[in-house]
Amino acid sequence: MKYTLTRANPDADTYPAQTRQTVNNPIEDEVNRNVFMGKLEDMVHASANWGRKNSLWPFNFGTSCCYVEYATTLTAVHDLSRFGAEVIRASPRQADVMIVAGTCFVKMAPVIQRLYEQMLEPKWVISMGSCANSGGMYDIYSVVQGVDKIIPVDVYVPGCPPRPEALIQGLMLLQESITKERRPLGAYVNDKGIYQPQMLPERDRKQADRIAVKNLRSPDSI
């Protein structure tokens, strides 16, 4: 059997030298991939946000024709349940995301505000359609020029009306935003020990203001 010696070619296509990666300590690399290295607080926030983004309960609230497209996302064609948001709630006290689908009239504004206040924390709002975003083509006295003038909005979905795919994309953007949030939990551990923020419900927090009211506002005012 004869052998021949050839000089190594670094530019060869077979086993190119420039793509080889060396591992200094394979045990350390294996540990970093399988063992969590970080703060317990970060892990708790990540776990809580993961559960929140995959269990969004929308509030069944439609004000105009955009609600037809919103309802289409619940059908088998689009299947909103893939994103954990198929549990539609009829009560704001059981929902954590309000999807304002359609035109917001001046007479609806106090109702939307009150329903938003009744939602439990943490809560989010998706503005769906041009009318909910900026009033749309209704630049008149009876239409609120954007639902963000009465309640805070997290995600805007453009369109007149937007397609169901656009709403699903907006929901995915909201889930991505929830993943990066650091909202206060019920109780967690910090450098000073166990900390539990005092988060009063809206009913108790605004009880003194309601008692002090002498003249009730008109239902068609903002």
Curated annotation (Swiss-Prot):
Residues reported in the UniProt entry to bind [4Fe-4S] cluster: C65, C66, C131, C160
Cofactor: [4Fe-4S] cluster
Enzyme class at the top of the EC tree: translocase
UniProt KW Iron-sulfur keyword: yes
A GO term for molecular function: NADH dehydrogenase (ubiquinone) activity
Keyword line: 4Fe-4S, Cell inner membrane, Cell membrane, Iron, Iron-sulfur, Membrane, Metal-binding, NAD, Quinone, Translocase, Transport, Ubiquinone
Places the protein is found: Cell inner membrane
Record's keyword annotation contains Cell membrane: yes
Domain of life, source organism: Bacteria
InterPro entries: NADH_UbQ_OxRdtase-like_20kDa, NADH_UQ_OxRdtase_20Kd_su
Catalyses which reaction(s): a quinone + NADH + 5 H(+)(in) = a quinol + NAD(+) + 4 H(+)(out)
Cited Gene3D superfamilies: 3.40.50.12280
Co-factor binding comment: Binds 1 [4Fe-4S] cluster.
Cellular compartments per GO CC: plasma membrane; respiratory chain complex I
Function of the molecule: NDH-1 shuttles electrons from NADH, via FMN and iron-sulfur (Fe-S) centers, to quinones in the respiratory chain. The immediate electron acceptor for the enzyme in this species is believed to be ubiquinone. Couples the redox reaction to proton translocation (for every two electrons transferred, four hydrogen ions are translocated across the cytoplasmic membrane), and thus conserves the redox energy in a proton gradient.
NCBIfam families registered for this protein in UniProt: nuoB_fam (TIGR01957), PRK06411.1 (NF005012)
Quaternary structure and partners: NDH-1 is composed of 14 different subunits. Subunits NuoB, C, D, E, F, and G constitute the peripheral sector of the complex.
Designated name of the protein: NADH-quinone oxidoreductase subunit B
Underlying gene: nuoB
